[in-house]
Each structure stands twice: as structure tokens, then as C-alpha cells.
Amino acid sequence: MGKRSRRRGQEAMPDAPEAAYTSPEGDVLTLRGAMTIATRQEYAALGGIAAATQEDAWQRRVEFLFERLAVRWELAGTEPLVKQKELLGRYRFASADERRWIRDVLREHLAEWFPDLEAP
């Protein structure tokens, strides 16, 4: 049996739920509400990686979560970013205030959607 025949009987995967968070400046960050088991294990393993400082380890964990969970980022007055490369690039370019807001949003999101994971 060919690949096409096998795929016909399969249902499409449902979209993961999403949650939107709005900053005081009006930016909207949309985060995915589902994470695979492999991603959860990868995130847990980050806690055991030797880093130069506690700050380095914290930054790695925040960036990892952002990369895996960010779906869309609407910045005031611009087209929304939806491509993974664009989202990560903009995160790396973010100001200290934007990073603080993102960290707080990730903590809130983890508490609501992934209470079993340790927030950075």
C-alpha cells in the first residue's frame, strides 16, 4: 500500500490551543497551549546543563520556552510575526523591558497550562 492510501484514513491533527497576552504598550504575544513529551523532557534537561552563571541558565530556559511556545507576536504598528525564525530573531532583539514582560508572560502561561513544569 502506498503512502497516500495510508494517509487517507487518518484524521488531521487538531490545532493546539493558544492563549494571547497583551503588554501595557499594546503588543500581543500568542503562546501555544500544548507541548510534546519530548519538548518537556528537553526543557527539564536544561536545568542540569552547566552554565557559566545562573543568569545564563535562566536565559537559555526562557529562550527555549519562547522558541517552542510562541506562535504570533503583534507589535504595535507592524505586521504580526508568525514565522519561527522571525519570532526568535525579534525576541533576541527585544529591549530589557520587553524581555521582562515576555519572562512574566511565560511564567503566567506555564502556571496555567503546564503547572508540572518549573518556570524560569
Briefly describe each language-model feature range:
Residues 29:
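Short N-terminal binding/cap micro-motifs at the start of the first secondary-structure element
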Residues 32-120:
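Short, surface-exposed, charged amphipathic helix/loop patches that serve as local interaction elements
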Residues 1-14:
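Short Lys/Arg-rich cationic patches that frequently serve as NLS/NoLS or arginine-rich RNA/DNA-binding motifs
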Residues 14-26:
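Short acidic-hydrophobic surface loop/beta-edge motif
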